[in-house]
Amino acid sequence: MRMFPMLSPSSRVLRTLATAGAALALAGCASTPPSANAPSGAVLQTAATHAYHGRFAVQYNDRLGRPQNVYGNFDWQEHGDDVSLELLSPLGQTLAIVKSTPQAASLELPNRQPQYATDVGELMQNTLGFSLPLAGLRYWLLPTPAPATPAQTVRDPADATHIKQIRQDGWTIDYLAYADAPATGVKRVNLVRVTPPLDIKLVLDQ
C-alpha cells in the first residue's frame, strides 16, 4: 500500500513512505459469474460496515519508469459505499488519508489542504504516484469477486471454503493465508497488475 523535498506531491509522499522505518517483512482457474462466488449472507449489502488494520507494501514504476517501493501501516474503515483509508508510517504517523464516496473523493496530506476529485483512482495516482484499487478491494478483502464485472476464481484444494485466487479487472489477487480459528477472514493477500505494473502486499492484523 518520499515526501519532504519540495519536488512534486508524489515525490514528497514517496520520500516519507520510503524513509519512515525498516522495510515491511512479508515472509495456486475456472471462469465464473461474479455473483456465483459471493459468500451467502449479508456481506454484499451496501449497508455493510468493515474495518481492516494492517501493513502494506507497494511496488510500482514512477512517471520516468523507475521502480519505487513504499510501505507502512494502514487503517481501512468502510460504511456502506463510503471508504476511508489512512496510510501511516511504521511509527504511526499519518501520511495520507483517502476518502471515497459515490459522489466524490478527497485526499489529505500532512500540513496541506485536502484535494478533491470525482475519481479516487486518478486522485491517488496524481498525488501519491500510485493508485490502490479501492472499489475492488471492498470485495476482495472479504474475500469475494466484485459483483459488477466477470471474474475467475480458484478454490484452495486443501480447503474448499477458502478462495485461493481471484482474477478480475486486470488484477490477480492471491490469498496466501487466512486467519487461524477461531478468527476468520484473510490474513495475507498479494495483488498484482501487469499494465501498468503495480504490486501490492497486505498483511491484515487480527
Question: Model-derived features: where do they sit?
Answer:
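Post-signal-peptide N-terminal segment of Sec-exported extracytoplasmic proteins
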Residues: 45-84
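Bacterial signal peptide processing site
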Residues: 30-33
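Bacterial N-terminal signal peptides that target proteins for export
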Residues: 3-18
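C-terminal motif of bacterial Sec signal peptides marking the signal peptidase cleavage site
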Residues: 24-28
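Flexible, processing/modification-adjacent segments and terminal tails
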Residues: 111-169
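Gly/Pro-enriched, hydrophobic low-complexity segments
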Residues: 146-206
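Amphipathic hydrophobic-ligand
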Residues: 68-72, 95-99, 196-200
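An acidic-aromatic
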Residues: 82-131
